[in-house]
């Protein structure tokens, strides 16, 4: 009906099959979701999904509905005039939305490259005050598919909860947690290499500030933005400058195991310490202080405890800060600079916290004196927060072959503890290289996708529940160092991210949190 603008069997003569076959490995490794970040392909996918949903809703609404001489009949029964009028009004609006999407299609030339930003022809500009690119972006932002479902009362069907869905959900959550931890550990590694200051902080919520915190949906964003501006000020830069190059953060929510009290663990990475940051042990006979006074009063919703992360040859030591001692006056035990990363990572992996987070506030577990107040507050799910592109920095891949990039998307954890970061960076590099491929070629070369949940449910009948997890794992075998090319091995060695290399580095660097 409207899918004719996509390649199909009737277009087969227009495609160079050798070229399409050559593209398939890179497109499969990169993935359509990554490639859809390119403007032209992204807009095609956006419009396709929007049209499919609107057509589906229209078809659903018209089931059993007939019109005769201005009267409406539903399953043979005549509808009241007010019901008919409302139905017609809503249906007309639905069809207007469809027509709007149909008007965009002629502006999306599938023979153009996927990185092209469509502007529109003369007719488009006569009818619209913005380019096709601006129109599509505004439509996606102001009219998401969820809003369409809500307005037309067409919710998504709830999935069946069974052993397969639970296994898949657990596997997805495990992968997400693993990716977050990899980004944290890579950021620690990079901060050490670049000589940045690392500060660990715990943010609590005071009883009298709970309501203010929950009333402000941007409380955490504003806090980290303020810290970023403090770093900018210390570098003599404007407050409205981007602080991405001088400040980053990683924040994990935790619900206390005793009574479910919400607090946050944050790691700040700063190229320059905020103005007024001085060694808390300067002039003291017992050097047992670790907190940064310059950051102590920046959290407006409770108590914070910003502590300098110390290790041999850290940025604090190079700035002349004294090495702190413990309560007994003994120098702090030296451990790897990665220790703080592992310390924060345990909160990412803490399953009891994930269970409480799924309930929202964990209000029932919070102490009894606050139960009434909490019942008046909106339920809210707090997730791990981090700076944009946090921990994603890797050695450039611009000179690597496509074959090498494909291998980097398939590496296992045994080859490098940063395999998921490598995968995303390799996919991004491939997306840039595929930018000059046409939309038609990408759509023709895209692999046939398998519904993993349906496949698992079909497989369970043959292999049984007990063997399902290992069977699924065997389907996604990862490459080891012995499986990859010399080019890929050389890249890992040069980047210093092989498991062996990272073990050596952890021995080189002493320190403690």
UniProtKB/Swiss-Prot annotation:
Gene: A
Catalytic activity reported: ATP + (deoxyribonucleotide)n-3'-hydroxyl + 5'-phospho-(deoxyribonucleotide)m = (deoxyribonucleotide)n+m + AMP + diphosphate
Name of the protein described by the UniProt record: Replication-associated protein A
Family, per entry: Belongs to the microviridae Rep protein family.
ZnF unnamed: positions: 246-268
Record keyword Disulfide bond present: no
Its EC number(s): 3.1.21.-, 6.5.1.1
GO terms (BP aspect): DNA replication; rolling circle single-stranded viral DNA replication
Location of the active site: 343 (o-(5'-phospho-dna)-tyrosine intermediate), 347 (o-(5'-phospho-dna)-tyrosine intermediate)
Keywords, sorted A to Z: ATP-binding, DNA replication, DNA-binding, Endonuclease, Hydrolase, Ligase, Metal-binding, Nuclease, Nucleotide-binding, Viral DNA replication, Zinc, Zinc-finger
Role this protein plays: Plays an essential role in viral DNA replication. Binds the origin of replication and cleaves the dsDNA replicative form I (RFI) and becomes covalently bound to it via phosphotyrosine bond, generating the dsDNA replicative form II (RFII). In turn, viral DNA replication initiates in the presence of host Rep and DNA polymerase III at the 3'-OH of the cleavage site. After one round of rolling circle synthesis, protein A is linked to the newly synthesized ssDNA and joins the ends of the displaced strand to generate a circular single-stranded molecule ready to be packed into a virion.
Lineage: superkingdom: Viruses
InterPro entries associated with the record: Replication_gene_A-like
A molecular function GO annotation: DNA ligase (ATP) activity
